[in-house]
Amino acid sequence: MELEFFKPPLYQQRYQFVKSYVDTYKPKKVADLGCSTCSLLHTLRFWDCIKVLVGLDIDEDVLSRKKFTLTPLPAHYLEPRNTSLTINLYQGSVTQKDPALLGFDLITCIELIEHLEAEELENFREVLFGFMAPITVIISTPNAEFNILFPKCTGFRHPDHKFEWNRREFQSWATEVAKCFNYTVEITGVGEPPRDSKNVGFCSQIAVFTRNYTESEESLQRKMECKSVYKTVLHIVYPSLQEEKYLRRAVQKVALFHAYQIKANFLQQFIHREEEEEPHNTDTEHRPCMDLKLTSRWPTLPQTEQDESMEPFLQEDTLYVPLKKIFSVPKVKELCGNMDNLRTMITGEATLSNDGNAILYHIDLENSC
């Protein structure tokens, strides 16, 4: 149930709150409890900082229907992520302990707690803050004081809600949880009320819990001995440049593209120079075409000091494109790290000189001169 004046829609504002947190703090392991249709997970998979993304929900049918929205697209294979990403979907209850959700940087519970019975809520806080104990927890829940602005709302906003708290009740619960489990909590929200109803507060109230301690390895190891109870609905590893086959493919794509650019530019300048010299040379059929150096200016390559060893050159009918020239491309350097890696990754896809320091291209001098 949402009012028309929420722009963007309230659910998007809740997701944006989480995304802003991710932008700021760069968590590597993120889980969404009560993930339902996986909409938040679908959005977060595009953040390079996240390496592990987990969704947990009690409804296996919904997870099975929506899991395909989290599988890699063709674009993910064409342009792999810089960092690894593993996505897991589990069917299970938020009141159950399972080692699969240990060691997380951020766990979100968006509009979840109001669906829990009182006993479940008590177990939930023990499982989340005592067992899972992530560095940060973001919990959102409806603000009951806002309901007077919903004309058709005579009870709770959703038939499955077991309760809806006002601001005082939510703050009291959050403060008690923070004190009990050694967290700091800040209360905020999304969904601004109309100007004439500011006194009701946000439509969705949000608590951000931050852990005040560092969990020991011994504590984690003890928890890891807990029996697994969640059912895996999806396990997928996204293609990334951390895998050699994807890194090699990316290096070849970038490096050989620039090598081909250098070759094309060389021939263009070569032909242009020949055409300029033609009126002044009566013996055009026997002009030497050897040892021509390229002095080009590349918009896509960095402008560095002149270095003879980096310049392409012709030797008989072979064009030599030094690997130093290719390695000077920022993206190539970023991907490879050093010249040896560049040489290794293009071997087999390009013809290299005997010393392995240049890419070779056969040039048809008869048609070029």
UniProtKB/Swiss-Prot annotation:
SUPFAM superfamilies: S-adenosyl-L-methionine-dependent methyltransferases. It comes from the Eukaryota. PANTHER family: HEN1, SMALL RNA 2'-O-METHYLTRANSFERASE. The gene is henmt1. It comes from Xenopus tropicalis. S-adenosyl-L-methionine binds at residues 39, 57, 93. Its EC number is 2.1.1.386. Its cofactor is Mg(2+). It is found in: Cytoplasm. The keyword Methyltransferase applies. One of its GO terms (cellular component) is P granule. It catalyses: small RNA 3'-end nucleotide + S-adenosyl-L-methionine = small RNA 3'-end 2'-O-methylnucleotide + S-adenosyl-L-homocysteine + H(+). This is Small RNA 2'-O-methyltransferase.
